[in-house]
């Protein structure tokens, strides 16, 4: 039996009704809507937490996040976690990436890590053979600096300077990784920072210069937020196109979800609450899965599921 490849796409702070296939009122998610039509859409998919890092711990380990000390910080904050040998995913702990790597898979994380900082923690220490992305919880999309103004863009274990809109950089790297795989199964964890603050589209380079505090309350609008989702969706379209071009699409399980519910400017209708709330709007998120070789098209699944179920499914 030919082993499938896996592409796990994680959005950041996406609301339950932000996508057209979940009732969104704006046409900003054509590729994800098509992916849902070609596969399976869950109505009752939940994130492991209403905030970032704990959900990522659960996804990486397949376990309840609070079995690890680092997940008790909700989320891991740059100001307290840099250099801290405790607040992170222990390299000795088995992960989805390490187990698939040991089974012969190529593994890459493109995007957001947020499970502890070097030198104690990092994607390459936890099963990923390639990494391009950010270590912290939120960065400026153009300057690639965290909320404290520290540069945060890495290639492997080393900081790297790149020009460009972060969502586009991640999409390009992810599509490139897919194209480089030759007759070998792979795990691509594509963990976008969008549409997490700061709210910037690829047309907002000047806004990046204006904003001095990237956290939460400076900048943004509903229209900016929707454009961020559209540009995220365009990037996902490029990755799906790369799967088609290489002939890998048929036997690749592609999953899309969010790490928690939506925050400011998002649409969580008809749910109550949002990010940081242990209410439906904070933990009920979009779940889309496409696997042409195995999953029927256009199905709606109303069973309960949680983030770490995907880990068990892949393994």
Task: Report residues per predicted region.
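Formylglycine-dependent sulfatase
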Residues: 1-315
């Amino acid at each position: 039996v030919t082993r499938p490849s896996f592409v796990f796409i994680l959005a950041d702070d996406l609301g339950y009704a932000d996508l057209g296939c979940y009732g969104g009122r704006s046409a900003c998610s054509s590729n994800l809507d098509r992916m849902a039509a070609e596969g399976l859409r869950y109505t009752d998919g939940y994130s492991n937490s209403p905030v970032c890092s704990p959900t990522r711990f659960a996804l990486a380990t397949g376990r309840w996040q609070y079995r690890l000390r680092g997940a008790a910080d909700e989320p891991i904050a740059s100001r307290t976690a840099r250099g801290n040998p405790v607040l992170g995913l222990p390299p000795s702990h088995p992960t989805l990436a390490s187990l698939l790597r040991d089974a012969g898979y190529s593994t890459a994380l493109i995007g957001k890590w947020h499970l502890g900082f070097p030198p104690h923690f990092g994607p390459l220490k936890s099963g990923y053979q390639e990494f391009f992305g950010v270590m912290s919880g939120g960065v400026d999309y153009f300057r690639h600096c965290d909320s404290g103004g520290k540069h945060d863009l890495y290639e492997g274990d080393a900081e790297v300077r790149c020009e460009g809109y972060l969502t586009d950089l991640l999409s390009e790297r992810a599509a490139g990784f897919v194209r480089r795989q030759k007759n070998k199964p792979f795990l691509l964890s594509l963990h976008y920072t969008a549409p997490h603050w700061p709210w910037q589209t690829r047309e907002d380079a000047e806004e990046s210069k204006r904003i001095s505090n990237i956290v939460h309350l400076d900048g943004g609008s509903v229209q900016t937020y929707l454009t961020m989702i559209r540009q995220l969706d365009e990037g996902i379209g490029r990755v799906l196109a790369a799967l088609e071009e290489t002939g890998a699409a048929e036997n690749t399980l592609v999953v899309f979800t969010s790490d928690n519910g939506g925050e400011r400017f998002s649409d969580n209708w008809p749910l109550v609450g949002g990010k940081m709330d242990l209410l439906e709007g904070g933990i009920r998120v979009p779940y889309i899965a496409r696997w042409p070789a195995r999953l029927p098209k256009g199905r709606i699944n109303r069973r309960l599921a949680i983030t770490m179920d995907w880990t068990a499914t892949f393994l």
